[in-house]
C-alpha cells in the first residue's frame, strides 16, 4: 500500500489476521520517521503527525482494497481527521456513502497541529480548514483541532460515558 504523504508516498505493509473471530487489518508504515516503531503509543512530540498519517493510511487502504464499510467508527482525537478526509477528499474517489460514528473518550486530549498536517494529508486549503465550523481550534486560531474536526464532520457523535456526554 502506497500512502500519499507530502506530495510523495510512504509504503506500508498491510497484515491481516483474525482477532476474536473478526478479520482485522493492521497497517505497518515503512518510513524514515518510524511512526509506530518507538516502544510507546502516545506521548511523542509528533503524535499529531503520526496519527494524521495513520488516518490517511486507513482511508487509502479502504479505497485501494475496494472495501466500503457502511460505517466507519472513529475513536478519540487520534482518528479525528478520518471524517474530515473522508468527506473532503475520499468521497470524490468513490467513498461517498460511508457514514462516520465518532466516539469521544477523553476531552482533555484533543490533538492539535498546524498547516504542515494539512499539507501532508492533502487537505491543501488551509484558509478553508482554519474556519470556526471546521478545524480551527477555539482557543488558538493558528492551530487545527483533530477532535473538533471529528465532531464537525462525523454523521453521529457519542461518548463513552454519561459524564463525558454532559461535559
Q: What are the roles of these predicted feature ranges?
A:
Residues 1-167:
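Catalytic cores of nucleotide-sugar-dependent glycosyltransferases that transfer UDP/GDP/TDP-activated
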Amino acid at each position: 500500500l502506497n500512502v500519499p504523504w507530502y506530495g510523495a508516498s510512504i509504503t506500508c505493509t498491510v497484515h491481516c489476521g483474525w482477532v476474536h473471530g473478526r478479520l482485522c487489518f493492521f497497517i505497518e508504515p515503512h518510513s524514515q520517521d518510524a511512526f509506530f516503531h518507538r516502544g510507546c503509543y502516545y506521548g511523542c512530540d509528533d503524535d499529531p503527525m503520526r496519527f494524521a498519517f495513520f488516518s490517511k493510511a486507513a482511508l487509502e487502504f479502504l479505497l485501494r482494497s475496494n472495501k466500503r464499510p457502511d460505517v466507519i467508527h472513529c475513536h478519540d482525537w487520534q482518528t479525528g481527521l478520518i471524517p474530515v478526509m473522508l468527506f473532503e477528499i475520499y468521497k470524490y474517489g468513490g467513498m461517498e456513502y460511508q457514514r462516520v460514528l465518532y466516539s469521544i473518550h477523553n476531552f482533555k486530549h484533543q490533538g492539535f497541529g498546524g498547516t504542515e498536517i494539512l499539507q501532508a494529508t492533502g487537505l491543501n486549503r488551509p484558509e478553508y480548514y482554519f474556519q470556526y465550523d471546521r478545524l480551527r481550534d477555539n482557543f488558538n486560531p493558528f492551530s487545527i483541532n483533530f477532535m473538533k474536526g471529528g465532531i464537525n464532520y462525523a454523521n453521529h457523535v457519542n461518548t463513552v460515558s454519561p459524564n463525558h456526554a454532559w461535559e
